Curated annotation (Swiss-Prot):
The presence of a 'disulfide through disulfide knot' structurally defines this protein as a knottin. GO terms for molecular function: calcium channel regulator activity; toxin activity. Residues 21-40 form a propeptide. Reversibly blocks N-type calcium channels (Cav2.2/CACNA1B) in rat dorsal root ganglion cells (IC(50)=40 nM). Elicits no toxic symptoms in either vertebrates or invertebrates during a period of 48 hours post-injection, when it was assayed in vivo by direct injection into mice and cockroaches. Residues 1-20 form the signal peptide. The keyword Protease does not apply. This is Omega-theraphotoxin-Hs1a.
Length: 68
């Protein structure tokens, strides 16, 4: 009886780990194809900027509170 339970637990662990591995590979492929990952947003020249503390960086350099 105990042996059957051990075998059942081992098989369930194997199935769950295989399922998780498949999903992690699929998620990585989706992430590589995602336009959100490939596209970097930045502020164009002339837009106001505040240095390193701003959420969206300048495409160039922040100089005198303007992107250049």
């Amino acid at each position: 009886m105990n042996m059957k339970i051990l075998v059942l637990v081992a098989v369930l662990c194997l199935v769950v780990s295989t399922h998780a591995e498949r999903h992690s590979k699929t998620d990585m492929e989706d992430m590589e194809d995602s336009p959100m990952i490939q596209e970097r947003k930045c502020l164009p020249p002339g837009k106001p900027c505040y240095g390193a503390t701003q959420k969206i960086p300048c495409c160039g350099v922040c100089s005198h509170n303007k992107c250049t």
